[in-house]
Amino acid sequence: MYIHKSVLLNEAIEVLNIKPDGIYVDATTGGGGHSSHILSKLTTGHLYCFDQDEYAYTRSKEVLDPISKENYTFIKSNFVNIKSELNKLGVEKIDGILYDLGVSSFQFDIPERGFSYNYDAPLDMRMNQSQELTAEIIVNRWSFNDLMRIFTRYGEDPFSKQIARAIEREREKRRIHTTFELVDVIKSALPAKVLSKKGHPAKQIFQALRIAVNDELRVFEVSINDALEMLNSKGRAVVITFHSLEDRICKTVFKERSTIDIPKGVPIVNLEAPYELITKKPIVAKEEELLENNRAHSAKMRIIEKK
């Protein structure tokens, strides 16, 4: 059994303002950490749990069924489909939604999933294991320009060009199949002073590949906008991000929804934005959690409420 510690668990549950009869969505169910706490607070309400990962379904069911089999529904789908999947079930409005955008520990810790540079495994990185696109396909088939683009945009790696060029040269000789093979290629493109720095030299490239394989940024932007439209009055969206790219999208969307940009000279008064930011600055983990859970160091939580 792989143990996944939910980040900012107590804080997220508190700011959701859970009503016992409310309708809630956990967009990223994973091992059921957040879901179990939401479900335990419901009486006549209902929780809809989204996750496209087969293991997440099995793991969360073990956690949630003992609490209540009647008060939750697991929807095995990417959260980009939140609106359409809920509409199929006759759900048009919700009282709260939670996104925990970090990769679950079990996904990192199962070597064959290929998410981690710490294990030698096939280059996979798919959240949905039924989709065709894998990290191996990207590494071996995408053009130099496309590799450099995703390494720069999604990995923000200053050596994106050099790494993309090294991959291009390597695959002329042989196909790159595994995580360790890719790590070796990445290291070959970096100067000694970078290799001697703290932190793994492949971290940003692996992040870029994971985002590209799963189309994570576009999917989140579509999903959060759909979710905000579904919120009831006083309903809240709570988002936990783990890197600057996701946080930037969240911050931008929340700002757009909570402000009204009226051109100068336009005689409009008393016009209110339909949403309110609950926190001006993101909530971060307390010292105690940082000591217990390494994943918490990069976590930021933002909250918005429908007026």
Regions found by a protein language model. Give the residues of each.
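S-adenosyl-L-methionine-dependent methyltransferase catalytic core, i.e., the SAM/SAH-binding region
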Residues: 1-307
